[in-house]
Amino acid sequence: MSRGFILSDEIIDHEINSPAFEEKHNFDASGKLNDLELFTKGQPFSLYKELRENAPIYFHDPMPMDPEPGYWVLTKYEDIKYVSMNPKIFSSQYATGNMLTLGSEENRHPKLFKSTIDHMLNLDGEMHLNLRKEHMPFFKPGYVDELKQKVSLKVTELLDQIAPMGECNLVKEVSQQLPIYTLSEILGIPDEDRQKLVSWMEFLELAQYFTYEMIKEQNEGKTDSTPDPAMIDMFNAMVDEMFDYGRFILKNKRKNPSNDLLSAIANAKIEGQELSDEFLDGSWLLIIFAGNDTTRNTMSGGIKLLHDNQYQKELLINNFDLLPGFINETIRCVSPVIHMRRTSLIETEVGGQKIGPYEKIALWY
């Protein structure tokens, strides 16, 4: 019996090339985008500006100990738009979402590695469109209106809870809670299981912190840096629990579908076949982590923007008709997804820079 389509199996052995052509812009940037210290206090806008003005298409060196070549960094709107609008030249399928490198094989987590690749965002062309089409009938106007009412009531509940506090940790009390609630409603997660999603997200974020510390030490030349074994065991147990639950609930939705997004995902097909276990894992991770993380960061970042720009805050308070524009500006300024990656499929040119086949391209938002 066929296991179904597994993108990660194709990606793992796919070679990435070093630049085939010389850089158009002979420029040495003042900082490195793979220096994670740059992002600990917000985005390095001054570095973005420097690159945009001096080398809008810039070849960035890989991180220390990275077995893959570096990547082209694009920072101009028109160049990013051009690459995004030409998927037959610039592939998502051979680009692994926002992963700038697959890293060395020994450092890949057996489940997380594949699940970050095997999902809808990393599909090209008809496979991507067909999978999206299978999800869309779920978002009917009646359902969306009902969801809006539920979310509105939840917002009121959260605000009522923090009002007596005077001040609070907005991320923990509101920004973290609302996306989890909304996702759980969309996905059909039982009330008694919803706190599990919060715990899994906190643990995944904690793991990112430990990874950051390890990469930081490697960048400083400490090649023997390794994480705490007890932390690894705890993390692996959490990952197993998260994916076991995801597979359980998705396979249950496959047998007994209901009016929720998980049922649509569980019964979707790629090239006529049910989604493989790897794609179920990837879809599950994409929804509960990426869907939650981006919404939470946008909400938190939006409040910080208003705090840092009091005049704009007063304008919005006095005229809620400005809210749609504020939401769009928040997404633009906060950039909850900082970059996405593509891979060139053929020899091509972007902004006057020649690029060879199978080179990495990072669209920096």
Give a label for each model feature.
Residues S2-Y365:
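Cytochrome P450
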